Swiss-Prot record:
Residues 108-185, 243-375, 402-529 form a coiled coil. It comes from Bacillus pumilus (strain SAFR-032). Keywords: Cell cycle, Cell division, Cell membrane, Coiled coil, Membrane, Septation, Transmembrane, Transmembrane helix. It comes from the Bacteria. It is a single-pass membrane protein. This is Septation ring formation regulator EzrA.
Amino acid sequence: MEFIIGLIVILLALFSVGYFLRKNIYKEIDRLEAWKIEILNRSIVEEISKIKHLKMTGETEQFFERWRAEWDDIVTAHLPKVEELLYDAEEYSDKYRFSKAKQVLTHIEDLLSAADSNIEDILKEIADLVTSEEQNRKDIEKVKEQYQTVRKNLLAYSHLYGTLYDKMEQDLDEAWEGIKQYEEETENGNYMKARKILLEQDRRLDQLQLYINDVPKLIADCKQTVPGQLTKLKDGYQEMSEKGYKLEHIQITKELETLNKQLARAEKLLIDELNLEEASSILQMIDDAIETLYDQLEAEVEAGQEIKSRMPELTEAFEKLEQDHTQTKAETALVKESYKLTAGELDQQKAFEKRLEEIEKLMKQIREKLDRDHVAYSLLMDEINQLETFIEDAKALHDTFKGHLQSLRKEELQARETLAELKTMLTDTVRQLHKSNIPGVPAEMKERAEKAQEMIHQVHEQLENLPLNMPAVNQQLKEASDTVRNVVDETEEMLSKVDQIERIIQYGNRFRSQNHILSEQLKEAERRFYAYDYNGSFDIAAAAVEKASPGAVQKLLAQQEKEYQHQ
């Protein structure tokens, strides 16, 4: 029983697959059948009939016969073959020979594609032929009119073309022969060949018109304009040479020889070969070269004027530097008697003197070159610019060194003034301590005050020791200033602390009789106070009073600050 059921299932599956494959094949057969009918219904005969108004000879006749033969072959051979193959495909499908049916369908598609492609080629060739004939009828009138215009212009200005006239007339005659050949090909039905000939004559006439427009100017350039420019350049060169300008580095004679050869080549290309493009290119190159040579001559003139203008100024600046050097050298000798110059300062003076030597050497070198006959001004500009840079550098070195010499005296006066201020500050601080009612001064503060006094004394000795070493003086003065200012700040802080302690203890005395612990703490604070331990005294007194009367210490300190601000 199970075997029978399995067999039935297999048969049903095979039937379903076969049905599905047959359905797809019949669907493809229907598609190819529709394609075949579409090809058969193409209006090829109607399209071919479009050329019947043309002359049925030559190319046109050949095209017509070939197109008709190809269409007949499609209708009588290809499509019947397709019909036969479609029938075969149906038979193979009905017999479940699906693989064979697919092969036949592929072959049918290839046949239909080939037929379709052949038809498209025919339609394109028909369109090209008809278009060529239509376009030829339009263009021939324009080309003939252009021919008449070119001939008229050539005859009207024949005197401008010289020996080129014969060659241009020959080209024009060839264009006319081409027009006549076009008409012959058209008469013979060769419309596409005639199209190519017509386009060729159109291009030929365009080129001739271009020649007519450009040749006169190019001939004038070759025979008059450019030779005149070269002669003018040569005359200018000779005139500058006679005025004493050194121009050998420009090598104009050699350049003129080269340019004249190029001019002859351009003329040959123009006259013998009618090669306007290359001749124009050479003439443009010659024009650029002439402009470059003029730029070089102009640069030489400008360089000469600039050197003649700048050399006296640079000479004067150098002489001023030498005078400054003599003056500063004497001033340096005097300064050395009172001040000790550092190695860096002395190096500045040496660098300045070395730069002066370089300037003198370079200036001598430039003057020697200016006296020679073969040195161009433009070749000296770099050295002139270098000389100016050297002079500017030397002036900067001199100004820096001289400014430092002048600053030494200012530094000394400033140091003495600062030292006097430090002495006054320290004296006032000591006097303030003596006038205050404090029990005494802590030992460490006394030591700092004595150290400050000693440092002031050392700076004073440095200022009396000649020659002065100002860097050392300034360093010691800075250290002394820092120490004195620290002593002053600590003294003010200590006196303020003493006043705070007295205010707090005085306030705490209100509670001593009632608070035994507070009384003992205040006694300890007083003991430390008279032992010069003001920080410890403040801490104990403030803690005790704050405990007895919270917020009181802060109010006392605020009151003190307010009173100090109004003093």
